[in-house]
Amino acid sequence: MANTLEIKKISTASVSAADICRVLDEANIGFVAVDNHCWAEAFPYRPTMEVRMAHNGKQLLINYRVTEECVRAVAPHDDGNVWEDSCCELFLSPVADGTYYNLECNAAGTLLIGFGAKREGRERAPQSVLDKIDRWSSMGRTPFSDIAGERTWQLCL
């Protein structure tokens, strides 16, 4: 089931990923719980995830906050298997023709973007596009193995 979230426009100049948390705080943009759990039978574990977003007319500002029992980010480079890591996912459909963008980013900011009408056969964004997306993670940007113990981390794009 698709959820719709209105994304507020804020008056701000270009924002770096490292400043997104502060900018969204100053604009009083609150977090919204992510309560859509895909593939629940196959993957019953469900971390707590919240997201908040805004735009300035040129940039979409995204801030995830995740609490989970173990954090992992081993995908070594963009366009890798980030879905096997602690990962945040966003589906955007800017036009009503059935196509959508799927953005997946792990806890270290490693990114995968696909575009298409269904899960299979989506066209992946080239590295030249991925390089234009600034990223910040409270876990740092270097891949890492499992870190056990409940913790909360944030990711900004």
Please state what every model-predicted region is.
Residues 1-157:
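Structural preference for beta-rich elements and adjacent junctions enriched in aromatics
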